[in-house]
């Protein structure tokens, strides 16, 4: 994978797979099997790979409806806090509800210089 000058957001590091990778890298650093610089490079590759994989492979659509509580736009990132949300997949099935949902929306690639 060519990383070039592009950088990707680190959003997916907080997903279950991202946390598992981070924990594993921490263990390898603690055991002195890799250095921290290599771990950071691996995480950078993960950021790019997960972004591109989701962009390419996810085809399902989701609709949601709720009450917008708060929104903000900072550093090219939108954040929405929504209450009483109902989710419906385009494949049918049962609707899912949640009391509160936080949605973070940004470009797949970070703008240059951030």
Curated annotation (Swiss-Prot):
It is found in: Nucleus. CDD domains: TFIIA_gamma_C (cd10014), TFIIA_gamma_N (cd10145). Keywords: Nucleus, Transcription, Transcription regulation. Its main location: nucleus. GO terms for cellular component: transcription factor TFIIA complex. One of its GO terms (molecular function) is TBP-class protein binding. InterPro entries: TFIIA_a-hlx, TFIIA_b-brl, TFIIA_gsu, TFIIA_gsu_C, TFIIA_gsu_N. GO terms for biological process: positive regulation of transcription initiation by RNA polymerase II; RNA polymerase II preinitiation complex assembly. TFIIA is a heterodimer composed of the large toa1 and the small toa2 subunits. Belongs to the TFIIA subunit 2 family. PANTHER family: TRANSCRIPTION INITIATION FACTOR IIA SUBUNIT 2. TFIIA is a component of the transcription machinery of RNA polymerase II and plays an important role in transcriptional activation. TFIIA in a complex with tbp mediates transcriptional activity. This is Transcription initiation factor IIA subunit 2.
